[in-house]
Structure formats: C-alpha cells, structure tokens
Amino acid sequence: MKYLLPTAAAGLLLLAAQPAMAANTGGYATTDGGEVSGAVKKTARSMKEIVDIIEAAQVDSKGKKVKGGAYPLIITYSGNEDSLIKAAEKNICGQWSKDARGVQIKEFTKGITIQGTNGSSANFGVWIVNSSNVVVRNMRFGYMPGGAQDGDAIRIDNSPNVWIDHNEIFAKNFECKGTPDNDTTFESAVDIKKGSTNVTVSYNYIHGIKKVGLSGASNTDTGRNLTYHHNIYRDVNSRLPLQRGGLVHAYNNLYDGITGSGFNVRQKGIALIESNWFENALNPVTARNDSSNFGTWELRNNNITSPSDFAKYKITWGKPSSPHINADNWKSTGKFPSISYKYTPVSAQCVKDKLANYAGVGKNLAVLTAANCK
C-alpha cells in the first residue's frame, strides 16, 4: 500500500487544534487514546474491518469528512493471522518484495485505541500519520511483508501523543542477499519520525528484529521527546533506537543479544539510559555514522557500572573505520534535562528477574512496581 502524505505543516496545524489528554503512560505521552467520553466501541476480526471502522469514523451521518474524526474509537481486534506468519517464517527471504500490509490511521485526532485480544495476531502493521491521541496495545505483530515498501510493524509520522504499549513484535534477525546492503527482509519494529513527539513505548517484547527503530528520519528531523520503558529486546541487531537529535529517556528495559549496536545517539541528541539491564551486547551505547555531530548520554543505575563489568555481562565493543564514540569507559558524556513526568524506576536486577512476567501480550496490561520486586 502506498499513500501520499499531506505536508508536515498542514498536519501540525490540524494537531495543534486538538486538546491534550492526560493518561499516565510513564513517559512523555499523555493520551488515553479512545478511552474518553463519547467513544464508540467496535470489534474487528481482520485488517480490512479495522480499516473500514476507521474510515467510517472520519465522516458524519451525511458522509462528509470531519476534521480530526467524527468520534473517538476503541477497536478490539480479535483476528488471527498465524497461518500467514508461519508461511513467512518458512520463506524469510521472500518477504522483502511482497506488498506491505497495514492499517493507516491518518488525520485522526479525536482519540483511537487499537487493542488485540489474547490469542490474536497480525501480519500487518499500524501506520500512524498526521494524527494524535493514539494507543496501540496487546497486539502481536509477526514477520511483516513489504520491506521494500517500508513495511514497518509500527510507524509514527508527524504524530504527537502516541502510546505503544504491551505489544509483541518479531521477525528474524537475518540478512538476505539481494536486498539493499544485503539487508534483512523486514523493516522496523517501531519508527518514530517526521516531527512526531511525546511518544511512549512501554512493556513491549521485541525480538528477532534487525532494525528496531528510528528516532528521526533524517539529520534535519531532530526535535522530539521519547520514552522507552519496560521493554524487552532479544536477538536484535541495531537501532535501540537510532536517535537523531531530541531527547530519549530509556529506563527499566532489558537488552539481551544485541548483534550490531544498541543506542546510537546522533545529531546532538541526548539520552538518559537509566536502570536498564544489558547482557550479551555488542556496542550497547554508541554514536557512529554521523560525521562529528555526536550526541551525548547520561548513564544512571544500570546493571553495568564500570568497564570491569563487561566480561561478566558479555559486553563487547567494535570500532568502525568512520568517526565514532563508544561508551567503552562507561561514563556519562552529558546531562539530561529535567523530566516533565513522574516515574518510579525499579532496580536493574528487578528488570532482569521480573520483567518477562509483564512485558508483551497476554499480560492483562500489568505493570512492574517495586512491590513486585521482593
């Protein structure tokens, strides 16, 4: 599927007219999605039914398009595409050239929640464009087709105030020859770009992904506030995220099996990397492939406290031929500004011991607190 996007300026004017909402997402997002007064609840059993429900919510009773949407939406998805996911798993290198499949939420600001039922699955993505007040929860996304058409699992373009929570996103961390740069067949798990800001990514289980996520599409797309918390990343290659400018706060995440690089802080971005657990990781915190506009990071209360911990947790470092900075001395290179939201991180050890009981689908949206660490 291909879509023409309105200009960023037009999208921002549309979004600016909408009131903010006030959920506690544990991060920069403050949206309840469709969980507001006047919401219409719908159930969908397929990608097409989700598309049809969203299209119907964008017009009034006379069929005239309503700016920002006619009413808030709560969509419960109960479909199962395990057969497509299993077929893709058997033909990994055949996915790149297939048509991308996805639900597009475009110019919708009334509030929308898409939430999967336990046991549901999707071989299609959710693409959020020029919208705001969007929540995606308890969705299981596997082996997205259409890498050549930017077939991300979740894509957020020019859309503030989005919450991506308690999902599972997976593919195969594998390179297929014949694709650009011998790249994998699959695109990103969660890309946040083109002016998107105030986004929270929480309690997701992301595994087998080569390019996990962008924070910014280019060296000029640099202004955003993002929070990543209580996510599990296993057997992933890079972009955790690839940060082009802006602010990234990452706390209480578990990183196990980074095969390329983790945080790549570029274009003078600033990252607060707090109370996370790292193991079996190559270049977990770095700045590279960015001439001299390196970003900075503040390292706080992670399981790694000094280079003497690297061997214990199997942390290794590589040195590319291009200019770069690695956190191989495990020291902060900058100071993160004050944070506008309240949060209470648990210890990195608790993340290691307990987070798997809370992150991903089928966990009833449960959250990890200090009381659970005992």
Curated annotation (Swiss-Prot):
- Catalytic residues, per the record, are R239
Report the InterPro entries cross-referenced here: Pec_lyase, Pectin_lyas_fold, Pectin_lyase_fold/virulence, PEL
GO molecular-function terms, A-Z: metal ion binding; pectate lyase activity
* EC number of this enzyme: 4.2.2.2
S-S pairs = C93-C176, C350-C373
Cofactor note as given: Binds 1 Ca(2+) ion per subunit.
Catalyzed reactions: Eliminative cleavage of (1->4)-alpha-D-galacturonan to give oligosaccharides with 4-deoxy-alpha-D-galact-4-enuronosyl groups at their non-reducing ends
| Xref: Gene3D superfamilies | Single-stranded right-handed beta-helix, Pectin lyase-like
Which positions does UniProt annotate for Ca(2+) binding?
Answer: D150, D152, E187, D191
Signal peptide bounds: 1-22
- Tell me the enzyme class: lyase
Q: Kindly list the biological process annotations in GO that this record carries.
A: pectin catabolic process
Pathway as given in its UniProt record: Glycan metabolism; pectin degradation; 2-dehydro-3-deoxy-D-gluconate from pectin: step 2/5
SUPFAM superfamilies for this protein: Pectin lyase-like
Q: Which UniProt keywords apply?
A: Calcium, Disulfide bond, Lyase, Metal-binding, Secreted, Signal
One family name in Pfam for this protein = Pectate_lyase_4
Highest taxon of source: Bacteria
Query: Which is a Gene Ontology cellular component entry for this protein?
Result: extracellular region
- Where, subcellularly, is it found? Secreted
Q: Does the keyword Transmembrane helix apply?
A: no
Name the family. Belongs to the polysaccharide lyase 1 family. PLADES subfamily.
Task: Give the protein's function.
Answer: Involved in maceration and soft-rotting of plant tissue.
This protein's name: Pectate lyase 2
Q: Which organism is it from?
A: Pectobacterium carotovorum (Erwinia carotovora)
Q: Which gene encodes it?
A: pel2
